[in-house]
Each structure stands twice: as C-alpha cells, then as structure tokens.
Amino acid sequence: MISADGAIALGLDFGSDSVRVLAVDCQHGTEIDTEVVYYPRWKKGLYCQAAQNQFRHHPLDYIEAMEQAIRQMVKRLSEEQRQHIVGIGVDSTGSTPAPIDEQGQVLALRPDFADNPNAMFVLWKDHTAIEEAEEINRLCRSGEFADYSRYIGGVYSSEWFWAKILHVTRADVAVREAAVSWIELCDWVPALLSGTTAPQDIQRGRCSAGHKSLWHPSWGGLPPRAFLAALDTSLVNDLDYPMFTDTYTAERPVGQITAEWAERLGLPTTVILSGGAFDCHMGAVGAGAQPYTLVKVIGTSTCDILIADDQRVGDRAIAGICGQVEGSVLPGWIGMEAGQSAFGDMYAWFSNLLSWPLHQAALTQPEWQPQLKQIESNLLASLTRAWAQNPSLDHLPVVLDWFNGRRTPNANQRLKGVITDLNLGTDAPTLFGGFIAATAFGARAIMECFEQQDIPIDNVLALGGIARKSPVIMQVCADVMNRPLQIVASDQCCALGAAIFAAVAAGAHDDVPTAQRHMACNIERTLIPDPVQVVRYQQLYQRYQQWCHTAEPHYAPVTKVIH
C-alpha cells in the first residue's frame, strides 16, 4: 500500500469524438485538472460512411490525442504533483475492437494497412455487422449448441465483438490473413502503455469480455471451438483459439508504464496501469453508484448500468438487456448493462436537418459564416427554451427513438426512427418536444425491462453533459419515468471512475468501495416528477408503445426469393 495523501490518479476516457484525461486527488476526490483533445482524422470524417453505418477510428487518433492531452495537462501541474501521479485507469466506448498481428500491433499501424478501415478500431456505433449478428442469434437459438446469448440478454448485437470480427473477416481477405487476434480499445490502451500488447500477454477485461464477447465462467470462458467454427471456420483457423480464457476486473494492475511512454507523456516510471472497462461501467463507479441504482450515462447515446447482488439474481438470465456480468462494475457484484442507441445523436440529427439552409447560405455568402455558425450553435438551446415556454402535450408528435436502431429492450439494429402525428400546426419547437419525449420514453422502457423481471430500481442517477446542462430534458425524463432523478455533479464521471480504479491498482486504496468513499462525486440536484405531467406523459407513453408494436414488424429482414 501507498499513502492516498497527496497521491494523484489519472483517468483516461476515450469517447466517440475525443479523449479526456482527468487528474484526481486520491484522498479527497478533488478534480485537479483536465484536458480534452479531439481525434483529428475522425473530425475530418475519414474512414466513415454514415449511410452504410460504417464508423471507424484510426489507432493513431487515440495515440496522438492521448499523448497531447496528457502532456498538456501534466505541464500545468507542479513538479511535486507530477511525481505523485501513481496510476492511470482507462475507459472507452464499446464494443470497439480492432485486429492485431502476432506482435500485438493494431493492423492499421502497419504501412500496408494504414488507410484500410477494416484494419482499424470498429467503433461501438458501427452497424455494418447486422447480418452477422443475426447469424449468431440464429445459431444460439438453433438447439445445436447451448444458448451462449443467455447472459447477454438473449440477443447478440451488431455493435458487439464477434459480429464485427465476423463481418470484417469475410469482407477483407488481407485483414483476415494478417490478424491473429482482436482486442477491445479499453484493453489495448493499458496494454500499449505497459508494453503488454503481445496476444499472449494481454490482460482481457471482465467488463468487455462478459458483456460483448460471450465470455462466461459457466461454460469455461468463450464459447467452444465448434460453435465459432459453425459461424465461420476462419474464427478458429485464422485467429487464435481460444482468443483468451481468463478475464480480470478493472482494479487489477495490468503493469507498470514503460520507460518510453513515461518519457513521451512526462510521467514517473513508477505509474501503474489498471485494467480497462467500458465508459458507462466506470462512470457508474465515478458517480458513487450503489446496488439497485439505475445509472444513466447520457451522451450521444446512453448506457444504463445497474448493480445487483448474486443472491437476488440467482441463476436467472435477465432478458432483453446487454448482459449481466459478475465484476463488470464492482468486484463481487453483478453488473447489468442496458442503453439507448441514440439520445444526444437524435437532437443533433434534428439540428443538422434544420441547419441545412444555414450551410447553403454559408457556401454562397462566406462573409456570413461567423453569424450563421453562431445561429447553428444556439439552435438546440433555442428550441429547448421555446418548447419549455409552451410545453403543450395536446398535439405532441409521437417519435420512436430508433434513429440508430434499438439497444434495449431487446436489441434490434434494423429498426429506424419514426415520426407520427404531424399536422399543419406542428412547428419546430413542438416537433423537438416530441424528440425529447421519445428519448425519455426509451429511458422508461429500459427501467420497466428490469422491473418486470423482479430487478428493483431504488434510485435513478443521470450523468454527462446533457444531464447537467439541460434541466428541461431531464425534467421530462423524471416525469416520464415517475421517479426522482438525481443529477451527478460532474461532467467527467467516466474519467473519474477510471481514476478510482487506478488508485486501487496503485495501492492508494484497499478496494473500490473505499476509493469511492474518498473520490466519487456528489449529487448536484434532484428533480422531482410533476404529478400533472406524469399523468399526461403516461397517456403518451402508451401511444408510444402502441406505435412500437405496430412499427417493428415493418423492419423485419426481407426473405430473399430464389428464382
């Protein structure tokens, strides 16, 4: 053990657009400093085709942004503070895997694959593997094998590990022949910084393996060779089998930072790397979540985390969610994951739609660009204010929040967004109100998915930029869910959670609950449901559910007729 007094832990949060580094005092939880750097290639739209649901991240985006963020922040610390940095924790989006070669190098870092999107990290929201996910689901339900989707909600998603591997393996012969394994981003960064990227040395995180890779101790780890071979023999002939057997909870040390990376980042060579996990799971820890608290990590999408005890769950498999994994959030507790595939992304889509004339005007009148950009940047805030001033629910359009498919309940990435009940009196603020209600309805559907299976929800926490900056949207969520909604007092809970795990791995605290008591953030405010609005939203929610049942069959896969 080392003393927590004066010790500093760093949390690295790899998001969809940027990486954030946060320095935290291990004794008092003070957030000392932070830095955010955007991914340069991603910002230019490289390697992505939104119309085909292809979203890829070049590994150099992660490396360059991480190096810049840490160096810039560390420069602002005193020499004494720099020497007291004891650990680094890492969280990331997920499932965001990439292919690696025999040396553990991500293929896109090699000259022969430098511009090949299939050799890069396949971002969580990449849905190019819908058909492959359906293959996995059919095989799980075929009766030929045990149902290996049992503990991930019964539906394997196109956003997850094996579906993405299967899609890329079939689409790209060169990648298939060069790759010996695949690695999640949250596992790769600690391995990179500690020099343990060789496939046999990688410490696979319990969180990513259990929620996305069909890993479970009841069948000895990953599904058997025969199951993967039945999907495609390349999964066992071209890739290492088993890809891994053991998994580790995130408070376990991965290793010590290498001398090269210590110098590049301006850090002591004694820094310890803790295990990686997904952003929302670490965000729940940073928010101080306790058992049976539903933690909503709200951003472009949402990830919802619930911690339950093994005795309550027993051997039950909770249907319709994104997995139940012992140790994926807190060691010794079952972490359950759910989420909405689009939340902030829906608002951004609506903003972009309305901004089209502004973009055209900027092209023809370049001198107007500063004013037009200002109008566009204020658009969502203006819409929110306009609707809040006249929040009529009498003619509110019903919107289905499937603009990026549906993650929970019951993952189905074929689904598309639906807007109904428009009339000639529907204006932009009213339609935006329908979007706000839709995201709240999606949140309630997740809550009910747990409760209907005897998993109680005693408390609801919301964290992230939208949660803190948009009380109007959060109040609608409280009214729709008919629950007090606690807003967490930090925009950086995911990075804070990563720092908490780093503090434990480095020995500044004995265990995660102790570290939480010292370092987790506080509640900023609590929103109470409005009884009148609760009743009115209940009626709209029933209509939302009716439209869900009506619309979903229209997105079933079309049977191909062979002539």
Swiss-Prot record:
<dbReference type="InterPro" id="IPR005929">
    <property type="entry name" value="Ribulokinase"/>
</dbReference>
<dbReference type="GO" id="GO:0019150">
    <property type="term" value="F:D-ribulokinase activity"/>
</dbReference>
<dbReference type="Pfam" id="PF02782">
    <property type="entry name" value="FGGY_C"/>
</dbReference>
<dbReference type="InterPro" id="IPR018485">
    <property type="entry name" value="FGGY_C"/>
</dbReference>
<dbReference type="GO" id="GO:0005524">
    <property type="term" value="F:ATP binding"/>
</dbReference>
<keyword id="KW-0808">Transferase</keyword>
<protein>
    <recommendedName>
        <fullName>Ribulokinase</fullName>
        <ecNumber>2.7.1.16</ecNumber>
    </recommendedName>
</protein>
<dbReference type="InterPro" id="IPR043129">
    <property type="entry name" value="ATPase_NBD"/>
</dbReference>
<keyword id="KW-0119">Carbohydrate metabolism</keyword>
<comment type="pathway">
    <text>Carbohydrate degradation; L-arabinose degradation via L-ribulose; D-xylulose 5-phosphate from L-arabinose (bacterial route): step 2/3.</text>
</comment>
<dbReference type="GO" id="GO:0008741">
    <property type="term" value="F:ribulokinase activity"/>
</dbReference>
<keyword id="KW-0054">Arabinose catabolism</keyword>
<dbReference type="GO" id="GO:0019321">
    <property type="term" value="P:pentose metabolic process"/>
</dbReference>
<keyword id="KW-0547">Nucleotide-binding</keyword>
<dbReference type="GO" id="GO:0019569">
    <property type="term" value="P:L-arabinose catabolic process to xylulose 5-phosphate"/>
</dbReference>
<comment type="similarity">
    <text>Belongs to the ribulokinase family.</text>
</comment>
<dbReference type="GO" id="GO:0005737">
    <property type="term" value="C:cytoplasm"/>
</dbReference>
<keyword id="KW-0067">ATP-binding</keyword>
<keyword id="KW-0418">Kinase</keyword>
